[in-house]
C-alpha cells in the first residue's frame, strides 16, 4: 500500500471540462502512467489521481507540475497520501533556475502562460484549419508550452511553439515529429524541428516586406496618378497663364504692327508722293495751258 502511494500523485485545481487524455498528456513525459482516476464534480475544480510505474517518476512529476498554469488554473500536485514535503523542496530548488522540469508557483506567477522563450520549435504541415489553440493542445504532449502561434504563407500553414525549458523542447522534437495532428475539421501529419532564427525568421519578414512593398508601390502609383492629375489640372492654369502673357505680348506689338503698318504706307506715300508730284507738275502745267491755248487759237481766227 505504501509503495503504491509513493507512486501515485494527487492533482488538484483542474478545469471542470478537462479530459483524461489531457491529464495523461500532462504527466506522461515523466514516465509510464499506470492508471488515471479523474474526478470532475458538478462544481469545479476537478481533481485526479495519477499512478506511475516508478516512484521516482512520481517525484519528477511533482517537481515539474506543482504550480503549473494549465489554461488559467494553477495545478496543485503532491503525493496521494497528502505529504507536501517533496513539492516544498521543489519550490526551494527549482524556482531560481528556470530550466528545471517545471515551474514553481512564484516563477509561474511572474512569467505567465504566454511568455516567449528561447526553447522554440517550428511545426510544418499543419492543416489550413489549424488554430493556435489546436497547435498548443497538440504540442502539450511534449512538455510545457508557454506560447504558440500559427501563420499562413505561400508554403502553407506553419506553427511556432515555445517551451518553458530545454528538456521539454528536446522531448517534443523526439516524440511529436512526424505525428498525426487532429482538430475538429481535419487531420494531417506534421514535422517538428528546432527553430532556426537565421533561416526561419526570414520567411515571415519576407512576407511582411512583400506586403509593405505592395502598399508602397500602390501608394506611389496613387501619388503619381495624383501628381499627374494635379499636373493635368494645373496645365490649363499654366496654359492660361501662358496665354495671358502671350496676349500681353500680342497686344504690346499691336501698336508696333500699327506703327509698322503705316510705315509701308508712308513708304508707299513717299514713293508715290514724288512721282505724282513730278507728274502733276509736269502734266498739270502743260494740261492747263493747253485748254487755255486752244480756245485762244480758236478764237483768234474768229476775230
Curated annotation (Swiss-Prot):
Pfam families, per database record: RRM_1
Predominant subcellular localization, coarse grouping: nucleus
Tissue and organ distribution: Ubiquitous.
RRM domain span: 7-82, 119-197
Origin superkingdom: Eukaryota
Cell compartment(s), UniProt: Nucleus speckle; Nucleus, Nucleoplasm
Keywords: mRNA processing, mRNA splicing, Nucleus, Phosphoprotein, Repeat, RNA-binding, Spliceosome
Entry's Gene Ontology molecular function annotations: mRNA binding
Post-translational modification remark: Extensively phosphorylated on serine residues in the RS domain.
Example of a GO cellular component annotation carried by this entry: nuclear speck
GO biological process, one term: RNA splicing
Biased composition (Low complexity): 246-256, 284-295
Cleaved signal peptide residues: none
Transmembrane segments annotated in the record for this chain: none
Bias (Gly residues): 94-111
Biased segments, Basic and acidic residues type: 81-91
Coiled-coil intervals, chain numbering: none
InterPro entries: Nucleotide-bd_a/b_plait_sf, RBD_domain_sf, RRM_dom, RRT5_SRSF_SR
Region annotation (Disordered) ranges: 81-116, 195-303
Compositionally biased spans, kind Basic residues: 209-245, 257-271
Additional notes on this entry: The splicing pattern of the pre-mRNA is regulated in a tissue-specific manner and by development, and changes in response to various types of abiotic stresses and hormones.
Its job: General splicing factor. Can promote splice site selection in vitro presumably by antagonizing the effects of the A1 heterogeneous nuclear ribonucleoprotein. May have an essential function during early plant development.
Protein family per UniProt: Belongs to the splicing factor SR family. SR subfamily.
Quaternary structure, from the entry: Component of the spliceosome. Interacts with SNRNP35, RS2Z33, SR34, CYP59, CYP63 and CYP95. The binding to CYP63 is phosphorylation-dependent. Interacts with MOS14.
Name of the protein this chain belongs to: Serine/arginine-rich-splicing factor SR34
Source organism per UniProt: Arabidopsis thaliana
Amino acid at each position: 500500500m505504501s509503495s503504491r502511494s509513493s507512486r501515485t500523485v494527487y492533482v488538484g485545481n483542474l478545469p471542470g471540462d478537462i479530459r483524461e487524455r489531457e491529464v495523461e498528456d500532462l504527466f506522461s513525459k515523466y514516465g509510464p502512467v499506470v492508471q488515471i482516476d479523474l474526478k470532475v464534480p458538478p462544481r469545479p475544480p476537478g481533481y485526479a489521481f495519477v499512478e506511475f510505474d516508478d516512484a521516482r517518476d512520481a517525484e519528477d512529476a511533482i517537481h515539474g507540475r506543482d504550480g503549473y498554469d494549465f489554461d488559467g488554473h494553477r495545478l496543485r500536485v503532491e503525493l496521494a497520501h497528502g505529504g507536501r514535503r517533496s513539492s516544498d523542496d521543489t519550490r526551494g530548488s527549482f524556482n531560481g533556475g528556470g530550466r528545471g522540469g517545471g515551474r514553481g508557483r512564484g516563477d509561474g506567477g511572474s512569467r505567465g502562460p504566454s511568455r516567449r522563450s528561447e526553447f522554440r520549435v517550428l511545426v510544418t504541415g499543419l492543416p489550413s484549419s489549424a488554430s493556435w489553440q489546436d497547435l498548443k493542445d497538440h504540442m502539450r504532449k511534449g512538455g510545457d508550452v508557454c506560447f504558440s502561434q500559427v501563420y499562413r504563407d505561400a508554403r502553407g500553414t506553419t506553427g511556432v511553439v515555445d517551451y518553458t525549458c530545454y528538456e521539454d523542447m528536446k522531448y517534443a522534437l523526439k516524440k511529436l515529429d512526424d505525428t498525426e495532428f487532429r482538430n475538429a475539421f481535419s487531420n494531417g501529419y506534421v514535422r517538428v524541428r528546432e527553430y532556426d532564427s537565421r533561416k526561419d525568421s526570414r520567411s515571415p519578414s519576407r512576407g511582411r516586406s512583400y506586403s509593405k512593398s505592395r502598399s508602397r508601390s500602390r501608394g506611389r502609383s496613387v501619388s503619381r496618378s495624383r501628381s499627374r492629375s494635379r499636373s493635368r489640372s494645373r496645365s490649363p492654369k499654366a496654359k492660361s497663364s501662358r496665354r495671358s502673357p502671350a496676349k500681353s505680348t500680342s497686344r504690346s506689338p499691336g501698336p508696333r504692327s500699327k506703327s509698322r503698318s503705316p510705315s509701308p504706307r508712308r513708304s508707299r506715300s513717299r514713293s508715290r508722293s514724288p512721282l505724282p508730284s513730278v507728274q502733276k507738275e509736269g502734266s498739270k502745267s502743260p494740261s492747263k495751258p493747253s485748254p487755255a491755248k486752244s480756245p485762244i487759237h480758236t478764237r483768234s481766227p474768229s476775230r
